[in-house]
Amino acid sequence: LLIAGCGVNSHDVSTPPPDSPIEHVDTAVVEEVVDGDTIRLRIDGSTETVRLIAIDTPETKHPTKRVECFGPEASSFLETLLVTDTTVRVERDVEPRDAYGRLLLYVFLRTDAGEMLVNREVVLRGFARPLMIEPNTRYQQQIVAAAFDAQRHARGLWKHCK
């Protein structure tokens, strides 16, 4: 993936762009990291399988595909961020679920430095590529800029995978 014409955006990702009002904001508790872009969260007392919006990590658990380059590393990285029983803030975008019934969310983690958009961080560190599917594009600019930065600095899959 070649991303041209993008610079790293210093926009605070904890605040959504002014032209995209948030309709649903919740907190959730991490139950499990399934793979690099899929997790299970406890939301309002029930467990939901969640697909992180706007990112795609290499496969590790697909029933018809082999394990892909940097897939296990992506899963491990997400496990270090989203430790079981950690409370996170989540945001829905326009389309709430994917074709597999998974809840589509942006996940935010509180850190000493402030609030981190996990979806963006996975891309920035080189564990995922951006995957923009309309109409869920609220943080598109930040995630694409993160991918450009990861590619430019040859982080993660940009260095180790063809």
Question: What are the functions of these language-model segments?
Answer:
Residues 5-162:
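Small beta-barrel nucleic-acid-binding modules, primarily SNase/OB-fold domains
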Residues 1-3:
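Hydrophobic core
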